[in-house]
């Protein structure tokens, strides 16, 4: 069992029950999945970009991402239907907790001029989105072997009903919020 998973069961659940007054353990919000998405609009010109991005995302997530394709053609962006335009990986279970642990304890402190993550990036339904500008904050990525700095979107999906519950859940996982 992952370190954060044990921490969730032993410390987070009792803390949230006390804070929000849940009657059942099953009411306590939990993280269901973490989705990593890398948009690669520049991949239209060069197919090697997709391979490099898939390699980076595989190292970061620990599992192979799926290549996302364009749903419809957009002439202004020189994209045809079916063109590969990104890579996405969904983490659940133990891999999800291990990624979250590495992200909070190792990757976020490596961000340049890091002052904490925004507390306003919730979607109104208890899910949290964070954008990472460079993939080199992850220790799995070797700085000398990358061809370009690429950002990625990290979407944390929870069972929380409100943003306050989700923020309390992530804060109990030692998420470094600004305010």
UniProtKB/Swiss-Prot annotation:
Family annotation (InterPro entries): Ribosomal_uL5, Ribosomal_uL5_bac-type, Ribosomal_uL5_C, Ribosomal_uL5_CS, Ribosomal_uL5_dom_sf, Ribosomal_uL5_N
**Entry keywords, A to Z:** Ribonucleoprotein, Ribosomal protein, RNA-binding, rRNA-binding, tRNA-binding
What GO biological process, any one, is recorded here?
A: translation
Please give the Gene3D superfamilies that the UniProt record associates with this protein: 3.30.1440.10
Listed Pfam families: Ribosomal_L5, Ribosomal_L5_C
GO CC annotations on file: ribonucleoprotein complex; ribosome
Report a single Gene Ontology molecular function: structural constituent of ribosome
Query: What does the subunit section of this Swiss-Prot or TrEMBL entry state?
Result: Part of the 50S ribosomal subunit; part of the 5S rRNA/L5/L18/L25 subcomplex. Contacts the 5S rRNA and the P site tRNA. Forms a bridge to the 30S subunit in the 70S ribosome.
User: What is the annotated role of this protein in its UniProt record?
Assistant: This is one of the proteins that bind and probably mediate the attachment of the 5S RNA into the large ribosomal subunit, where it forms part of the central protuberance. In the 70S ribosome it contacts protein S13 of the 30S subunit (bridge B1b), connecting the 2 subunits; this bridge is implicated in subunit movement. Contacts the P site tRNA; the 5S rRNA and some of its associated proteins might help stabilize positioning of ribosome-bound tRNAs.
The UniProt entry's sequence similarity note says: Belongs to the universal ribosomal protein uL5 family.
Identify this protein by name: Large ribosomal subunit protein uL5
């Amino acid at each position: 069992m992952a370190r954060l998973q044990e921490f969730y069961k032993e410390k987070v659940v009792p803390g949230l029950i006390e804070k929000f007054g849940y009657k059942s353990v099953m009411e306590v919000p939990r993280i269901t999945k973490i989705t990593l998405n890398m948009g690669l609009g520049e991949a239209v010109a060069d197919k090697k970009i997709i391979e490099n991005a898939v390699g980076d995302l595989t190292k970061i997530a620990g599992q192979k991402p799926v290549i996302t394709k364009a749903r419809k053609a957009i002439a202004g962006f020189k994209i045809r239907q079916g063109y590969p335009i990104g890579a996405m990986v969904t983490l659940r279970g133990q891999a999800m907790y291990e990624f979250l642990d590495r992200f909070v304890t190792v990757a976020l402190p490596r961000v340049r001029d890091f002052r904490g993550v925004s507390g306003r990036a919730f979607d109104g339904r208890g899910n949290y989105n964070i954008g990472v500008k460079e993939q080199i904050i992850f220790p799995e990525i070797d700085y000398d072997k990358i061809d370009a700095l690429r950002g990625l979107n990290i979407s944390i999906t929870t069972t929380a009903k409100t943003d306050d519950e989700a923020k309390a859940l992530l804060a109990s996982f030692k998420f470094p919020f600004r305010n």
